[in-house]
């Protein structure tokens, strides 16, 4: 299996839920899976409800919180902005150095970005630049409702123009009683973007490890997804 990068059309679209669910589902199928979320803003990485803690718990990796998330910032802002407020900076070389230390600890890694694909992570580099530097294909998480066609298309086209391989799209957060927009958007997104919809996942009323894993296993063909990660360009 190849490692891959989970990015999104925006913040709050469900990248962590999707990443955690995939990690648990892959592990259930005996995959040797690791997780890497290099940046975290607004909450300590060791907090039991942090994205880092959830990723660690659901992947069951032996990597420490510090290895999973080497850079954390106090303010819930874009990493570059949050770092500047603390008088700090993280270079692309810093991130890649941490990645080099852990990338051979597991057969496959799910790497999660921060916010959308164009969020600034440091001076002169964005999430997209990190994806390129890591030489990973991307999975794009998007929301299901009105406006998502535009945001998703722009994200996919931008990724393609950057030379990033897009494995597919996961539409996350569909309501229990979906509106007409949520019913019609997936087919339009797939037609316009010309990349596969890997899954359409519902909005969780209660977020727990069990619910996340069950949701992913129910709404995404995990075996096909794993096969997709084994295919090169």
Swiss-Prot record:
Gene3D superfamilies: P-loop containing nucleotide triphosphate hydrolases. Keywords: ATP-binding, Biotin biosynthesis, Cytoplasm, Ligase, Magnesium, Metal-binding, Nucleotide-binding. One of its GO terms (biological process) is biotin biosynthetic process. CDD domains: DTBS. It catalyses: (7R,8S)-7,8-diammoniononanoate + CO2 + ATP = (4R,5S)-dethiobiotin + ADP + phosphate + 3 H(+). Pathway: Cofactor biosynthesis; biotin biosynthesis; biotin from 7,8-diaminononanoate: step 1/2. It is an enzyme of class 6 (ligase). Its cofactor is Mg(2+). The active site is at 37. ATP binds at residues 12-17, 51, 112-115, 202-204. GO terms for molecular function: ATP binding; dethiobiotin synthase activity; magnesium ion binding. InterPro entries: DTB_synth_BioD (IPR004472), P-loop_NTPase (IPR027417). Its EC number is 6.3.3.3. The keyword ATP-binding applies. Pfam families: AAA_26. Signal peptide: none annotated. Its main location: cytoplasm. Mg(2+) binds at residues 16, 51, 112. It is found in: Cytoplasm. One of its GO terms (cellular component) is cytosol. It comes from the Bacteria. Substrate binds at residue 41. Belongs to the dethiobiotin synthetase family. Catalyzes a mechanistically unusual reaction, the ATP-dependent insertion of CO2 between the N7 and N8 nitrogen atoms of 7,8-diaminopelargonic acid (DAPA, also called 7,8-diammoniononanoate) to form a ureido ring. Homodimer. This is ATP-dependent dethiobiotin synthetase BioD. It comes from Bacillus velezensis (strain DSM 23117 / BGSC 10A6 / LMG 26770 / FZB42). The gene is bioD.
